[in-house]
Design a protein with these regions (language model features):
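Alpha-helix capping/helix-boundary segments
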Residues: 103-104
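Surface-exposed amphipathic alpha-helical tracts and adjacent flexible/coil segments at the periphery
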Residues: 1-25, 30-33, 37, 55-56, ...
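Radical SAM/AdoMet-radical enzyme domain recognition
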Residues: 56-57, 95, 110, 116-118
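Gly/Gly-Pro- and Ser/Thr-rich, intrinsically disordered tail segments characteristic of DNA damage-repair
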Residues: 80, 115, 119-128
């Protein structure tokens, strides 16, 4: 373990230019994005060259680094043009590329010397010898495989001076650090070249072959047949362990997720790191609030993955041990008039007069109120606003700022385990 605490970088996903700006404004120290080539998220709204330039300029002006994921597994011919791509990224001021394929690493080193290369989690780095190997080729950081334990992480830290990046939040692949071909076989989309259809998230029935007799999951251990769908990672409670063991960068998954998600996770992990760097007492004073905040954007149950032990089926597979989140993202503030306490908001979901909502902003600012004096952009009084991206005005009891987000509570479902291990779904 390190003797002096070092504040880690909070690395936040940004699937679009809008999300990049939100991540920066909500506390990210660095963001990772995808370009239009060599990445693994073909549907993430990847950045054009002009958007990359704008995003880098915006982030750098606020002291935030930008990394580009170029972590696809290349087949013969896929690498054509990569040298020019990496050189262009370097020349526009990019801080690092995230790469897994040795061919792309070699090309980047040759064509774009000086550009930091980070080894992607797709390369499945699970031991310090891997760090030693890639250091010879000029890499400056390694993103650990999600399967690495905290004990292994601590040992790696003692034996390398390369930067360590570790996933702390978001979706986990049921396969080994993304080495999966389910999508290739089931939907003809190559997961390792950006086309994953997330086949592991589908429902499955189990058949006893060759007789073809259907069998339910053993003893109800995997509710609702989500037999390959992993729960999500959340290490917010364990920030002290990550910092004490010298992790340089805390990586949050989710380039395809919403600005609601991006703003919330950036806010929470920045607050957690800042608090623990102040003192352990400061961290534990806000820990429960941080946990509750992250549940507001959760899509699945949350767990610590492989950090502390190999999880059992009931710990790792989706099946609901607590309620589905009861919050929905309804809008963001674009303007505020302090004289009339009127907020102009851009709507993202249906808003009704009288809805109970929560406003939140950078720095962990929160307050709740009811929607009052709802008007459309023409000043007409309305009771319901059903059209996404419409500009609306409301009266608020406290000051808000452009960029603040708005959530509405909604009726949800609760999935509970019963004594026999099966699941039961009830209304919230």
């Amino acid at each position: 373990m390190t003797t002096t605490k070092k504040r880690p970088e909070v690395l936040v996903p940004a699937g679009t230019l809008e999300k990049l700006k939100v991540a920066v404004n909500y506390g990210a120290d660095a963001v990772f994005v995808g370009g239009q080539a060599y990445g693994l998220r073909s549907r993430a709204g990847n950045f054009t060259i002009d958007e990359l330039r704008e995003g880098i300029e915006y982030a750098h002006a606020r002291g935030v680094d930008v990394h580009v994921a170029s972590n696809m597994v290349t087949h013969e011919g896929n690498e054509k043009g990569a040298g020019e791509w990496f050189r262009e990224l370097r020349d526009m001021g990019l801080d690092a590329v995230i790469v897994s394929d040795p061919a792309l690493i070699e090309i980047c080193s040759t064509y774009a010397p000086g550009l930091n290369i980070h080894l992607s989690t797709q390369a499945s780095a699970t031991n310090v010898e891997t760090f030693h190997f890639w250091k010879q080729y000029g890499l400056t950081r390694v993103v650990l495989a999600r399967e690495v334990t905290m004990e292994e992480l601590a040992e790696i830290r003692k034996r390398t001076d390369l930067e360590i990046e570790a996933f702390v939040h978001g979706a986990m692949c049921i396969s080994y650090s993304g080495r999966c071909t389910l999508s290739n076989h089931m939907s003809d989309r190559d997961a390792n070249r950006g086309g994953c259809s997330q086949s592991c998230r589908w429902k499955y029935d189990l058949y006893d072959m060759p007789f073809g007799q259907e069998r339910k999951s053993i003893k109800g251990e995997v509710p609702e047949e989500y037999s390959m769908s992993a729960v999500d990672m959340c290490m917010i409670e364990n920030i002290p362990d990550l910092i004490d063991n010298g992790v340089d960068s805390l990586k949050i998954e989710g380039r395809m997720k919403s600005v609601h998600y991006v703003s919330t996770v950036a806010n929470c992990y920045k607050a957690a790191c800042d608090a623990y760097m102040e003192s352990a007492e400061a961290f534990y004073a806000i820990k429960d609030d941080l946990i509750n905040e992250l549940w507001k954007v959760a899509q699945r149950e949350l767990a610590t993955g492989f950090y502390y032990k190999t999880p059992t089926e009931n710990e790792q597979l989706f099946g609901a041990r607590r309620k589905i989140p009861q919050y929905k993202f309804v809008g963001e503030v674009v303007d505020f008039d302090p004289a009339t306490m009127t907020a102009t908001i851009r709507q993202r979901n249906v808003i009704l007069e009288g809805d109970h909502v929560e406003f939140y902003g950078p720095g962990f600012r929160h307050f709740e109120c009811d929607i009052k004096d709802l008007h459309d952009a023409n000043g007409n009084k309305i009771d319901r606003a059903p059209n996404p991206m419409e500009l609306l005005t409301i009266t608020v009891p406290q000051e808000v700022k452009p960029g603040d987000m708005i959530r509405s509570t909604k009726e949800g479902l609760i999935n509970l385990y019963q004594k026999d291990g099966s699941s039961k779904t009830v209304r919230a």
